[in-house]
């Protein structure tokens, strides 16, 4: 009996021990099931995030709630937003689950929103048979083939040694009348100009002819002489480094005048107009010369015999008493150009600007503009109502500058993009760029992309580039994208009418890859004050959906001319309110609405991307109100005081503006003297 009891007791102990071990094992697996996600979650937030968070707080004048481990610490989402499928911001947990996908996209550097051209085949788009969609399908098809060849290595740079074509730099270039006409009235300056270079043009203006403007007629005689940057960028109109336009007859004032200016990407700068009055004493001189000399004017008071001439004599006596040396006008000079009368014009490159003399007399001086240098002036064009007899260029540079666009790339680690953060960012900036805009992208990297917010990855900026028609450009573009890590290639053949596809890709990246609170679009010739842009967005009360920029209201499409829009493309009389394309901001929910509509083939696509954005925001506004904020500081035409963005800035102007922002601590333009 005792033995039996002992056996029973020992068996019960063994059974209890097994149960205990099973409970411990179950508890162990239970702990591990909770521990593993915790380990991954804590491991995803590195110490660098904390450091960058403090630098972000230091960069802005007022605190901004970013970072932290809870949903409320990242985006404060109210109940109203919670119920709205388009409004809610992604919480960190969901974003972290997407991290592997995000990293893969980052390494690929290719937008995947346009899988292939068949995306436009399955219907759904209301205007699927339009010219736009046919153009898009063809561009995506060709782009995919080009990219597949690049990605697979089938398209490679030529391995055969290329004989470097060293262009000679002659000290002097001259052409006769017939040669000039045969060369399309352009004199090529192989190595540009240098200090002291001078060009002489011998020509005769035509007699005035009748031109009609509607019901009005006018007698017109004018010509244009331009220094052009012929080697700036292929496929674009060359920048006009100096535009010299004498109007003998036909100016709106009714008097002969001389207009001077510069033009970059079809955007004119601030002009200099000489109308016969000498520049005032308070205007700056150019190498000691006045900007505009005086000549006789056909005024009612008899030109120089009137009050103006008396005033000039008084000024001369006053300057003499004060010890200031300034010559007095002793001759009644005529306007330097006349119909049917031969002239000899000389253009000279000085220390501070260009100086133009006619028949040995100084006429005008034009100060250099920040965006251009003398070596950029590789062509002289003379067009209009004029016969050119000969052109001479002398004292030209002896060295040959490299005009290869790739020379602007500086393969240094300092210019590489920081890695993507592990949590949503405050602002994503998508920058539209063309494949061969190597200099523009490098200037952006060296200027406003060095801002503390960008370097700390609180703000992420990426270039969105379509494929170029030339394969060698695409090969260099792929290398650039792989090295710097800041280029997203949108795989279609670039076309001006398809820029809107890049805009959709920007929204998709901002929503799905970085989950940005705000999404901004700008161009590669736009200078952005990143901190000011965020502050402007944060001014919107509450957590409203927003659309911020330089808003156009009640604009009508142009039906004639170069930028004409057909009724098939846009049947409505007016465009919706839209922000100018060089710089605008969207809230996350608006960007997500655009991406969702595109993926579901409900998005109407129009060739003008800024108008398209206004149209999409208007549609979103039908279901949820959008705070539309208009500000002229998102400058469309050049640069203004206290700008948020400045458009049409050349690479040199971008570097200049960044230098001023760093040294002075405040924004200052670089396109005015």
Swiss-Prot record:
TM helices/strands, residue ranges: 20-40
SMART domains listed in its UniProt record: Gal-bind_lectin
Transmembrane as UniProt keyword: yes
Pathway: Protein modification; protein glycosylation
EC numbers on record: 2.4.1.-
Cofactor(s) recorded in Swiss-Prot or TrEMBL: Mn(2+)
Similarity annotation: Belongs to the glycosyltransferase 31 family.
Protein name: Hydroxyproline O-galactosyltransferase GALT4
Annotated source species: Arabidopsis thaliana (Mouse-ear cress)
Gene: GALT4
């Amino acid at each position: 009996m005792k033995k039996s009891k002992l056996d029973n007791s020992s068996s019960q102990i063994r059974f209890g021990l097994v149960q205990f071990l099973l409970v411990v094992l179950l508890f162990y697996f239970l702990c591990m099931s909770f521990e593993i996600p915790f380990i991954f979650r804590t491991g995803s937030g590195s110490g660098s995030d904390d450091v960058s968070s403090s630098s972000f707080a230091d960069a802005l004048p007022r605190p901004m709630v970013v970072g932290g481990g809870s949903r409320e610490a990242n985006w404060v989402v109210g109940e109203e937003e919670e119920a709205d499928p388009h409004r809610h911001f992604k919480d960190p947990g969901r974003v972290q689950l997407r991290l592997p996908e995000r990293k893969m996209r980052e390494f690929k550097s290719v937008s995947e929103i346009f899988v292939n051209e068949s995306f436009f085949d399955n219907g759904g788009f209301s205007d699927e048979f339009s010219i736009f969609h046919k153009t898009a399908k063809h561009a995506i098809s060709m782009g995919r083939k080009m990219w597949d060849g690049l990605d697979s290595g089938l398209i490679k740079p030529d391995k055969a040694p290329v004989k470097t074509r060293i262009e000679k730099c002659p000290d002097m270039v001259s052409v006769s009348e017939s040669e000039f006409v045969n060369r399309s009235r352009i004199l090529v300056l192989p190595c540009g100009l240098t200090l002291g270079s001078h060009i002489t043009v011998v020509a005769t203006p035509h007699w005035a002819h009748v031109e009609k403007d509607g019901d009005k007629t006018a007698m017109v005689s004018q010509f244009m002489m331009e220094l052009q940057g012929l080697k700036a960028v292929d496929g674009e109109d060359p920048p006009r480094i100096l535009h010299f336009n004498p109007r003998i007859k036909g100016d709106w004032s009714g008097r002969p005048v001389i207009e001077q200016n510069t033009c970059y990407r079809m955007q004119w700068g601030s002009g200099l107009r000489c109308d016969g009055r000498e520049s005032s004493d308070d205007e700056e001189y150019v190498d000691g010369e006045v900007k505009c000399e005086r000549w006789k004017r056909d005024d009612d008071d008899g030109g120089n015999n009137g009050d103006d001439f008396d005033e000039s004599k008084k000024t001369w006596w006053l300057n003499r008493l004060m010890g200031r040396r300034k010559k007095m006008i002793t001759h009644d000079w005529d306007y330097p150009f006349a119909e049917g009368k031969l002239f000899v014009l000389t253009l000279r490159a000085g220390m501070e600007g260009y100086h133009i003399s006619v028949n040995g007399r100084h006429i005008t001086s034009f100060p250099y503009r920040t965006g251009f240098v003398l070596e950029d002036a590789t062509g002289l064009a003379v067009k209009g109502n004029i016969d050119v007899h000969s052109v001479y260029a002398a004292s030209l540079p002896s060295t040959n500058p490299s005009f290869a666009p790739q020379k602007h790339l500086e393969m240094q680690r300092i210019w590489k993009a920081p890695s993507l953060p592990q949590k949503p960012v405050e602002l994503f900036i998508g920058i539209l760029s063309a494949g061969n805009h190597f200099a523009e992208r490098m200037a952006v990297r060296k200027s406003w992309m060095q801002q503390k917010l960008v370097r700390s990855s609180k703000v992420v900026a990426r270039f969105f580039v379509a494929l170029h028609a030339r394969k060698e450009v695409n090969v260099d573009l792929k290398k650039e994208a792989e090295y710097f890590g800041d280029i997203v290639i949108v795989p279609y053949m670039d076309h001006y009418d398809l820029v809107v596809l890049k805009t959709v890709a920007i929204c998709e990246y901002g929503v799905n890859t970085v989950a940005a609170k705000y999404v901004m679009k700008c161009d590669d010739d736009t200078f952005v004050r990143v901190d000011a842009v965020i502050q402007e967005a944060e001014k919107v009360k509450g957590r409203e959906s927003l659309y911020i920029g330089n808003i156009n209201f009640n604009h009508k499409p142009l039906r004639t001319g170069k930028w004409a829009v057909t009724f098939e493309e846009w049947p409505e009389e007016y465009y919706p309110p839209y922000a100018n394309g060089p710089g605008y901001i969207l809230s996350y929910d608006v960007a997500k609405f655009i991406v969702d509509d595109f993926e579901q083939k409900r998005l109407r696509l129009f060739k003008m991307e800024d108008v398209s954005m206004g149209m999409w925001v208007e549609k979103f506004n039908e279901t949820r109100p959008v705070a539309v904020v208009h500000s002229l500081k998102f400058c469309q035409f050049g640069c203004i005081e206290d700008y948020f963005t400045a458009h049409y800035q050349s690479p040199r102007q971008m570097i200049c503006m960044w230098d001023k922002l760093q040294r002075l601590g405040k924004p200052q333009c670089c396109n005015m003297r």
